Regions:
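Histidine-/acidic-rich catalytic cores in large beta-rich domains
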Residues: 1-165
Length: 165
């Protein structure tokens, strides 16, 4: 797939990323799924981004990201992302997931393994966020503290009890 901008213009990319754009491929991704809009969303763990490690571990980040793929033209456009600005505090190197809820126009993102490499923390503290799709404002944020560093959460989903039971 060839990365393109919002106008369909090809981007100049290599292993170090793409020039003059926020487009990036996912690195160590989890939970890829198609949305009701036909886009692809993934939780981008972000480890080994651009096939290398940053100078400082605290420069790592994870994100939820959405792509529009045109199979006919073999192009991919990044249309949405969240998490990059939250930096290392929201970095989940091992697992995580993302879901789009079209009924509320929100993304549900679970950064599941945050703090796993922070030696000052005795437990993993996962973060489940519900993000307004248009504004990227956090509508709900839950911190989930595990019993220790050996208890690794995998995924979290917001469910509607009326439908689930």
């Amino acid at each position: 797939l060839k990365p393109v901008d919002s106008h369909g213009k090809a981007l100049t990319c290599d292993n170090a990323g793409c020039e003059n754009t926020d487009f990036d491929w996912p690195w160590m991704q989890h939970a890829a799924s198609l949305t009701s809009r036909g886009t692809l969303i993934v939780f981008d763990n972000g480890d080994a981004r651009h096939l290398e490690q940053p100078a400082l571990p605290t420069m790592k980040y994870s994100r939820g990201v959405e792509y529009r793929i045109n199979e006919k033209d073999m192009t991919v456009q990044q249309v949405w992302e969240y998490g990059k600005d939250r930096g290392f505090a929201w970095y989940a190197p091992v697992t995580g997931n993302i879901r789009y809820d079209g009924s509320k126009d929100v993304m549900q993102i679970f950064a599941s393994s945050t703090g796993i490499f922070d030696k000052s923390k005795k437990a993993i503290e996962s973060t489940f966020d519900v993000i307004d799709y248009k504004t990227k404002k956090i509508e709900l944020e839950m911190k989930i503290k595990m019993m220790g560093k050996k208890n690794m959460p995998y995924r979290a989903e917001k469910i509607d009890p009326k439908i689930a039971f």
